[in-house]
Amino acid sequence: MVMIHIFLTVMVVGGVSLFPETAEAIVMGPSMQKLTWHYYKVYNTCENAENFVRHQVEIFYKNDKSIAPKLLRLLYSDCFVSGCDASVLLEGPNSEKMAPQNRGLGGFVLIDKIKIVLEQRCPGVVSCADILNLATRDAVHLAGAPSYPVFTGRRDGLTSDKQTVDLPSPSISWDQAMSYFKSRGLNVLDMATLLGSHSMGRTHCSYVVDRLYNYNKTGKPSPTMNKYFLSEMAKQCPPRTRKGQTDPLVYLNPDSGSNHSFTSSFYSRILSNKSVLEVDQQLLYNDDTKQISKEFSEGFEDFRKSFALSMSKMGAINVLTKTEGEIRKDCRHIN
């Protein structure tokens, strides 16, 4: 059975222990071994660091639920480029955040606020890279995701270059997407799971219009797109016919909308050919990801557990530890 296959995959990849009662996943693969669970408590450098982060996230979330998808995107943009080193937070005319793919990134204000609080409590101790990982975990948990363990002890990168940003277009093929995830040490289950982050948040119409009007340069809409959903999207995203035309935002998952809730309805929409982005819809075009999508649409807990594992794995990509990098005093600038 597919459910058993997925569950066993989650259990054995990277030496994983799952705790069904809390839907938490602990990853002890090679990259994670450089990090420590509750690092700041274990080494008695800032015992309540994670509590301080959580408190600030809870305050912010009450006023702005969109912080969950914003932080998810920010963490993805950081980890998938040069590793989880908070380089995406650095300011500068040629920094990563200035790359076209990073247009519209958000969440910086909350990270700044958390850093200020931690510098007051434990000066020069907690890295911006750890703050970003912890804050993302706490925000998506408030939105309905599991509160997975975040291993800590990361240090902050010293450079940030927009030329290194190779984040792919949301219109890439399944094979291209799979190749990209594999290059970061992630597998097919991770890809299908992490794309589920699109269960909340928004995107610009410019990333969707080709599906609506010029799929694969045919001058026609995507043939697989549900015709009623196609009509709805066309109303929100008119053809781009002139330079400087406004670029509206649309919800990645209309079912959750402004609630920005973490749900498995994203996968139900894939199975109904109602995905907003082409990269999401293409999960239906491969036998493995199609089966995973079916499992997740039918079993929310399976999705939550897999999400916990994949987020932990993503958060360990090319981390800096020990004497590498630095602990920034200001997340936007190196010391």
Swiss-Prot record:
<keyword id="KW-0964">Secreted</keyword>
<feature type="disulfide bond">
    <location>
        <begin position="205"/>
        <end position="237"/>
    </location>
</feature>
<feature type="disulfide bond">
    <location>
        <begin position="46"/>
        <end position="122"/>
    </location>
</feature>
<keyword id="KW-0408">Iron</keyword>
<dbReference type="GO" id="GO:0006979">
    <property type="term" value="P:response to oxidative stress"/>
</dbReference>
<keyword id="KW-0349">Heme</keyword>
<dbReference type="GO" id="GO:0005576">
    <property type="term" value="C:extracellular region"/>
</dbReference>
<feature type="binding site">
    <location>
        <position position="199"/>
    </location>
    <ligand>
        <name>Ca(2+) 2</name>
    </ligand>
</feature>
<keyword id="KW-0732">Signal</keyword>
<comment type="function">
    <text>Removal of H(2)O(2), oxidation of toxic reductants, biosynthesis and degradation of lignin, suberization, auxin catabolism, response to environmental stresses such as wounding, pathogen attack and oxidative stress. The enzyme activity has to be proved.</text>
</comment>
<dbReference type="GO" id="GO:0020037">
    <property type="term" value="F:heme binding"/>
</dbReference>
<feature type="disulfide bond">
    <location>
        <begin position="128"/>
        <end position="331"/>
    </location>
</feature>
<dbReference type="InterPro" id="IPR010255">
    <property type="entry name" value="Haem_peroxidase_sf"/>
</dbReference>
<keyword id="KW-0560">Oxidoreductase</keyword>
<feature type="binding site">
    <location>
        <position position="83"/>
    </location>
    <ligand>
        <name>Ca(2+) 1</name>
    </ligand>
</feature>
<feature type="disulfide bond">
    <location>
        <begin position="79"/>
        <end position="84"/>
    </location>
</feature>
<feature type="binding site">
    <location>
        <position position="78"/>
    </location>
    <ligand>
        <name>Ca(2+) 1</name>
    </ligand>
</feature>
<dbReference type="InterPro" id="IPR002016">
    <property type="entry name" value="Haem_peroxidase"/>
</dbReference>
<keyword id="KW-0325">Glycoprotein</keyword>
<dbReference type="Pfam" id="PF00141">
    <property type="entry name" value="peroxidase"/>
</dbReference>
<feature type="glycosylation site" description="N-linked (GlcNAc...) asparagine">
    <location>
        <position position="259"/>
    </location>
</feature>
<dbReference type="InterPro" id="IPR033905">
    <property type="entry name" value="Secretory_peroxidase"/>
</dbReference>
<protein>
    <recommendedName>
        <fullName>Probable peroxidase 26</fullName>
        <ecNumber>1.11.1.7</ecNumber>
    </recommendedName>
</protein>
<feature type="binding site">
    <location>
        <position position="85"/>
    </location>
    <ligand>
        <name>Ca(2+) 1</name>
    </ligand>
</feature>
<feature type="signal peptide">
    <location>
        <begin position="1"/>
        <end position="18"/>
    </location>
</feature>
<dbReference type="InterPro" id="IPR019793">
    <property type="entry name" value="Peroxidases_heam-ligand_BS"/>
</dbReference>
<feature type="binding site">
    <location>
        <position position="258"/>
    </location>
    <ligand>
        <name>Ca(2+) 2</name>
    </ligand>
</feature>
<feature type="glycosylation site" description="N-linked (GlcNAc...) asparagine">
    <location>
        <position position="216"/>
    </location>
</feature>
<feature type="binding site">
    <location>
        <position position="87"/>
    </location>
    <ligand>
        <name>Ca(2+) 1</name>
    </ligand>
</feature>
<feature type="binding site">
    <location>
        <position position="255"/>
    </location>
    <ligand>
        <name>Ca(2+) 2</name>
    </ligand>
</feature>
<dbReference type="GO" id="GO:0140825">
    <property type="term" value="F:lactoperoxidase activity"/>
</dbReference>
<feature type="binding site">
    <location>
        <position position="81"/>
    </location>
    <ligand>
        <name>Ca(2+) 1</name>
    </ligand>
</feature>
<keyword id="KW-0575">Peroxidase</keyword>
<keyword id="KW-1015">Disulfide bond</keyword>
<comment type="similarity">
    <text>Belongs to the peroxidase family. Classical plant (class III) peroxidase subfamily.</text>
</comment>
<feature type="active site">
    <location>
        <position position="73"/>
    </location>
</feature>
<feature type="binding site" description="axial binding residue">
    <location>
        <position position="198"/>
    </location>
    <ligand>
        <name>heme b</name>
    </ligand>
</feature>
<keyword id="KW-0479">Metal-binding</keyword>
<keyword id="KW-0106">Calcium</keyword>
<dbReference type="GO" id="GO:0042744">
    <property type="term" value="P:hydrogen peroxide catabolic process"/>
</dbReference>
<feature type="glycosylation site" description="N-linked (GlcNAc...) asparagine">
    <location>
        <position position="273"/>
    </location>
</feature>
<dbReference type="GO" id="GO:0046872">
    <property type="term" value="F:metal ion binding"/>
</dbReference>
